[in-house]
Amino acid sequence: TDITCGYCHKLHEQMSDYNALGITVRYLAFPRQGLQSQAEQDMKAIWCAKDRNKALDDAMNGKGVQPASCSIDIAKHYTLGVQMGVNGTPAMVLSNGMVLPGYQGPKELKAFLDEHKKQTSGN
């Protein structure tokens, strides 16, 4: 995710809808503006916050980012994303490594995942 990405905000706002459909989303920091950008610094502060979930919620809701520091290396998040084939946000990586680029609404994603499961399980 990237806190400067409009569709990442939309996805985050709908997280309870994804979860209600049985979809679990785990976040990886992927600052689109690159490493050493303000977005990277802000995302590091979020990941270093005492309450990371609240810090991310606040940032996604436009409440700003409170300074925080720790030893987390956002470059590792970014590099992992690149290695998995992510080149923009939002992007979802399935458990089999398949990358779904772009925003997918909760119902659309559920339908895709159900069909993908059928195709990959042979049923």
Language model features with spans:
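Conserved helix-turn-beta segment immediately C-terminal to the redox Cys motif
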Residues: 12-32
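Thiol/selenol-based redox catalytic cores and closely related redox-interacting motifs
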Residues: 34-110
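Short, catalytically relevant binding-site loops at active-site mouths
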Residues: 6, 31-35
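Short, solvent-exposed mixed-charge patches
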Residues: 118-123
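A short linear-motif detector with a strong N-terminal bias
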Residues: 3-5, 25-26, 71-72, 78-79
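Conserved redox-active cysteine motifs that mediate thiol-disulfide chemistry
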Residues: 1-13
